[in-house]
Curated annotation (Swiss-Prot):
This is Adenylosuccinate synthetase. Its main location: cytoplasm. It comes from Xylella fastidiosa (strain Temecula1 / ATCC 700964). Disulfide bonds: none annotated. GO terms for cellular component: cytoplasm. The lineage of its organism: Bacteria, Pseudomonadati, Pseudomonadota, Gammaproteobacteria, Lysobacterales.
Amino acid sequence: MGQSVVVLGAQWGDEGKGKIVDLLTEEIGAVVRFQGGHNAGHTLVINAKKTVLHLIPSGILRNGVLCLIGNGVVISPAALRKEIEELEDTGLEIRSRLKISPAAPLIMEYHIALDQAREKAAGGRAIGTTGRGIGPAYEDKVGRRGIRVADLHYPDQLAEKLRAALDYHNFVLTRYFGVDGMDFQRIYDEMLVFAEYVEPMKSDVAGILHDLRKQGKRVLFEGAQGTLLDIDHGTYPYVTSSSTTVGGALSGAGVGVQDIDYVLGIAKAYATRVGGGPFPTELDDKIGQGIRDRGVEYGASTGRPRRCGWMDIVALKRAVAINGITGLCITKLDVLDGMDKLKICIAYEYHDKRSEYAPLDAQGWEECTPVYLEFPGWNESTHGITSWEKLPPAARAYLCALEELAGCPIGIVSTGPDREHTIMLHDPFA
């Protein structure tokens, strides 16, 4: 029986991870976020009520489930407090169930200013970040000048670290980008207020996870973004700033390889991408626009329209291999309802040669031309179907083809946004 399950994106993010995490948290001990920040946007629909979470794990809507934020997550104090208060306004008990690693880095105001200044200066070469300071915060972490949750407990040490960081970042902001610098005293005072607020939630997340493992409790590791946006394995430099793979779950939560029993990869029945970067199967036509409209493909965090395209098996197989994915969850099947024909990319034409492997650089991806297999669509509605047998034959054939081509079994199919709109073929915890 699986005790610890990692849920992660197998495409370019926005695959529907939040719904699946919520679905699987009915009888578990904890959900842990292990990377990213409030650039994530996990949308949950329960009894037709929509909730969008950016930083807090998706298990928060389940009473009694412990929600953990690991050391691999970068935390915006303002965003965290806002999200907690919005959830508390709905009557949920949050702070007694939310535990935050002292080793988690903080996103400071100067990180946001730097992120936005860079994107503006880059013009047409911009990465397409959310402008929320995620990348600069990770840079400071690696550069060993980051301020972490633990530093808030020591006011003198906090002041020293903040002055040093501001000296560095204000120089870059004012001298290189020509924008205003940040005021030390105002930021320091705000951090002291946040220190008092976050102190009761500060906990040894890795220690909690080890204890839960010993107790035989189920734990779900919730990824953000997607494998193809991974800082190492994605379409660099059009990537996020953290490790979105199963390796990121280990280092970002503080557990070992032996602590993971099942890796669930989430993929849409088609493909989407936000921001810049290569996207071989992109549909820049009325078909792509139709998918965008039916799938409501607009960012939960930014509202930006998502680029839409056909399912890319070459990219999906790469995600399966990198993560050692045990089973797939295919989401948004119902978005394809009513389409006459569907296509799946099974290979690339690259430099006059056919390849079933993805290039290792963004320029290589840009030079790929997809090779498609065509499948008949279906006119019947799949929305809300909860049984495999009730799916239209053409929909079942499409899913079986995805499974065979990806070389990985499909364990879950999502047929709508609500928690109940799901076909459970295999429970990852079973």
